[in-house]
Each structure stands twice: as structure tokens, then as C-alpha cells.
Amino acid sequence: MNSSKTTPQRLAVSIVCSLAAGFCAASLYVTFRHGFNGEAMMTFSVFAFWYETPLYMGHATPVFYCGLAIVVSTSIVVLLSQLIISFRNHEHHGTARWAGFGEMRHAGYLQRYNRIKGPIFGKTCGPRWFGSYLTNGEQPHSLVVAPTRAGKGVGVVIPTLLTFKGSVIALDVKGELFELTSRARKAGGDAVFKFSPLDPERRTHCYNPVLDIAALPPERQFTETRRLAANLITAKGKGAEGFIDGARDLFVAGILTCIERGTPTIGAVYDLFAQPGEKYKLFAHLAEESRNKEAQRIFDNMAGNDTKILTSYTSVLGDGGLNLWADPLVKAATSRSDFSVYDLRRKRTCVYLCVSPNDLEVVAPLMRLLFQQVVSILQRSLPGKDERHEVLFLLDEFKHLGKLEAIETAITTIAGYKGRFMFIIQSLSALTGIYDDAGKQNFLSNTGVQVFMATADDETPTYISKAIGDYTFKARSTSYSQARMFDHNIQISDQGAPLLRPEQVRLLDDNNEIVLIKGHPPLKLRKVRYYSDRMLRRLFECQIGALPEPASLMLSEGVHRDGQDLSQQAAVTEAQGLGDIDSIPNNMEAATPQNSEMDDEQDSLPTGIDVPQGLIESDEVKEDAGGVVPDFGVSAEMAPAMIAQQQLLEQIIALQQRYGPASSHSVK
């Protein structure tokens, strides 16, 4: 069925036939060179030209040279005619064929181990041999489709993390990627971070998505905050569609207000809206307090609405993603940033987003926000001379994150900003369930390397068969006559058939995979298993030392107010009746003792995070700082946690110096 296998044989047969035709033509010339007569016809022989050759006569004659010219010219004409006819017939029904290893190696997709810089998708030979590995070549984005236990983790994800020369942001659903590859990444020079907000032992680094907005000029904060709100707050259910815009506006106003107060965290926004009392009174109070015109406008508009409408807005806001910050662990894990997105292209960084399968749906808003914010920051400016590293977004089981509109758009543009996507799903129907047909086609058309392992659904095998295409073959049919016993007719015709039928895709064995590469024929390769491959196993076993685990995150009293958890406080808020606006707690006053305690420890703590350029710490700012410290603290006995607390304090002081006093209600 593979036409590429018979091409050399057909070419050899064509050459032999053309030479034979040329030799016969030369024999005709030798026989009839004196004219056509009966005697010449009686003595004709196909070997007549042989008797005129120097091999037979011992010397060359003019007849030999003329005959030789006839052989060459006739052979060329016959050979070209055969090739033209063959190609015309071959292209009539399709030209599908399997790619050869040589042509893919020449195109740069098959590389030796010591030349691998990109992801690894497969291998040309078994695990014990020194074969070539399939990488992405010139294609920036890739798609891996494989069901459960098909080998996508051991064959693509882990080998890629062991060998990729660049920064990686990996969605680690089971936490095994961090355990299996983090030491290799660290040994390769990466700065390794583990972001696991719901880790049972609270071992997680922190990331605050609002700090990037707080560091921007005031005129850009509103636009970036709206983008943040669009990425985080999503409508849950049909009834929420009419209130989603208002809920996002509330979130925008809350972020801008918390930046003014010196508490640039989403947890502070949750606390702001979880205060007891009538919402219209709260919004009216915030409109008077805020100095940001956009925040004032939003709060004024909200304060003029009916209580039921305000309840709908806040309900959609909470259900859309903000209620996640009722969890003290999430609030603490997003109170500061241990890594900077701006360093991803500047130095090799590996960020593992670890979450258990049971918690993935819960923290999906936070993970979705992180991915989309990183994409947005990378596309703000083209890479500089010192930003030479590519950034790989490794999205395993990314369908659980929901619809990623920013990534759906960025897949067509982010390659110019050194961004690379690797999407991993179990079947193409997973894309159909989240994105419409246009969105699914957008992913399929922009992923230049598509790897398929044995699938059991109906959509994926059909797509593979159609994408590979048809080939042309010679079909022979024989018909017999009923009137005459031995009378039959044989017909040979060109017909087309799929190079790989859908049922053959389903029967693909466990050791092979099919790869579709844009602009090249399909490729059939062996799967890679890092634990048995002679090169990858050596790299994996060379990992030594302890895992680069972060210190346990300690929760302070700021997370529990008056012995009541904030998640419970949210429930109490709904049960509150009418409340006086004066009863709204001033978070800034509540934070004053914490600020004083932190100031006492400041001189003994080293400096951690870089303060944005142009922001200088001063004693006057410390004295006038009236902003609220986020509800996150540390144990005084643990030095790493104390350093993190000092980092947060420096950020707050720098932000307050830039934007002025946090509020007219600050405690003096």
C-alpha cells in the first residue's frame, strides 16, 4: 500500500526497459542502414548492434557510433515518457506516503541526543540503540493526543522536561513531574519553583498576579486590570451572562482600591467585598474613599442599584472565581511573588503548577489566570538582546482549565515573542467540548507537530485518516463471459484509498505513534520511554540530592480574624441584615499592629525581591504607611518565611511611596 517503497523498483525497471528499447532501435538501424528490402528483413536480429560493437569486432566503426547515439537518445525519450505517465497516474487519486527518516533528518526534525534543544516526541529505533529523536524543528507549537496510560507522560512530557533548553511553565496535575524532573532542571541551571496553593503540607512558592499591575503606571492600570478580570471572572450558568460585565467591573474597582490601600492582592479584594452590611452602603463608602476616577465611577454606579441587583453582581463575582480566595491557603499563596514573569526569557526558569486531580476544577480559575497573564506579559514587548530563552507552556490535561481565550488568540502570535505551546489532551473530542468548531480548528491549524497515540474515540481516528490522505494504486479486475467458458477480460485501472484507515489507527500497537508535521508527509515512529531509553535513563538516574521543595507556608492570625476563618466570614456576610456604614471595619487600622511588628523585625532581615526601578525605600514612608498588609504572615522562628514577609513589606512601602498615602482613613 505504500507507494514510496515501490518507487526505486519502478525506476530501475523503467531504466532497463528504456535501454532495451534503445538497443532494439540501434539493431534496426544496423539491419536496415542500406535500405528496406526482403533480404534485410529475413536477416534481422535484435543483436545486430552487438555485432558492430568494439567488444565483438575489436575496434569501433562509424556504424557503432551512430548506433550508440540511437541507444542513448531512444532510452532518454522512453524513460521520460514512462516517468511522465507514471506521475500523472500516481497523482490522479492521491500522493499520500510515509515520510522517510532521511528526509526528516535533513529537514531538522530528527536529531541526535546531543543536539536536542526542543521537546522530544519519539525515536527512530528501540530504546537500546543510538537512534535519532523527533523534535519540533521549525514548528513552535505542538499537540499530543493520547488516552490514559498510552505513554504521553513517560514518552513526551518527562523527556521534554529532562532535555528542553529554555524556561518551562508546566501544569503538573499529579505532582509527579516535579518529583521526577525538578532535580534535573535545577542541575541544568534552572531556577525551580513549585506553585501548589492547595498542597497538604503547604509547601508552595507564591505568586501574586496583582503585583504586576501595581508596578505599572497609573494610566495603564485600568486596562490591565480589566484584562485580569476578563481572564479570572467567568460566567457560570445561563443566568450569569447578564451580570458578568458588572461583576468584572466590581472586581476592577476592587483591585484599584486595594492598590491604593497598599494591599495589591486578590485576597484583599475578597476581604473588601466580604465585609458585613448593605452592599450599596459599602460601595458608597468606597466611592468616597477611592481617589481613582474609574473606581469611583464604578462604585457610584453600583451604589445606585437595588439590593437584589447588587446581590446578583456579587454572587456572579464570587461564583465566577473570586470565592476561591475564601480559602486561606490560596490567599496566602497569592500574597506575594517568589518569581518574576519578566525573567522567563532572561534566565532559565521552571515553574511547576502542582495540583491534585480532585482540586484541579477548584483552582482552575487561578491556574487559568496565571497562564493567561504570563502570555499577556510576554507579548507586551519583543525579546531583548538579553532575553534569549524560549518559554514552553506545557499544558497537560489543559481541558480542565476551561476555555483559555487569551491562549486561543496568542497561539497565532506568541511565537514571535519566544513563546511555545504544548497541548496534551486525551482525544480531539476534548477540544470540541470546550471550544466551538472554529476554536478547535484554530488549535489544529496552528500546532505544526501533532502526535497521536492509539485512540478509542471516533473523531480522532477519522481526523488522522483524512489528514494523512489517499494514495493511488493499480487495481486489476477480471470478468468472465457466460457464453464462452474460457473467454475472460482483464482490466487494470488507477484507484485511490486511504493510506491509513480509521480502524487501522485504533489498532495501532503500544510501541508506535503517528506524527503529523506541517508541510511534510506523515511519520510513523516508536514511542520513547524515559526509564528504558539508554540516553534518557542515564539523564534521569543522574539526579541526586533532595527535591527543591519550598518551605512550608505558615498561616498567621491575619487569615483568622477573631478566631473565625474568612471562609466562614463570607457565609456570615450573607446572613447579615442592615448594617450601619460606620460598622464597616477599617482594614487599615487592623493592619497597624502587624505593620509595627514587621517594622521592628525589618533591620534584622535581608532584602529579597527587587523593588521596581525608581522606587526608593525611606523612613518617612515607613512612618506614614497606612496601607493594609495582606492577610498573610509567617512564623518568627522560620527564617525563610521571615524573609518572605520582609519582601512583601518592601513592596508595600515602595508602592505607597509611588502612589502617595493609601487612604484618608489611615491611622496616624
UniProtKB/Swiss-Prot annotation:
Keywords: Cell membrane, Conjugation, Crown gall tumor, Membrane, Plasmid, Transmembrane, Transmembrane helix
One term under GO cellular component: type IV secretion system complex
InterPro entries in alphabetical order: P-loop_NTPase, T4SS-coupling_protein, TraG/VirD4
Topology class, membrane: Multi-pass membrane protein
Gene3D superfamilies for the chain: P-loop containing nucleotide triphosphate hydrolases
GO biological process: protein secretion by the type IV secretion system
TM segment ranges: 12-32, 67-87, 153-173
Highest rank taxon of the organism: Bacteria
Coiled coil spans: none
Localization per record: Cell membrane
Keyword hit for Cell membrane: yes
CDD domains referenced in this protein's UniProt entry, alphabetically: TrwB_TraG_TraD_VirD4
Region (Disordered): 577-612
Family classification: Belongs to the VirD4/TraG family.
Name of the protein: Protein VirD4
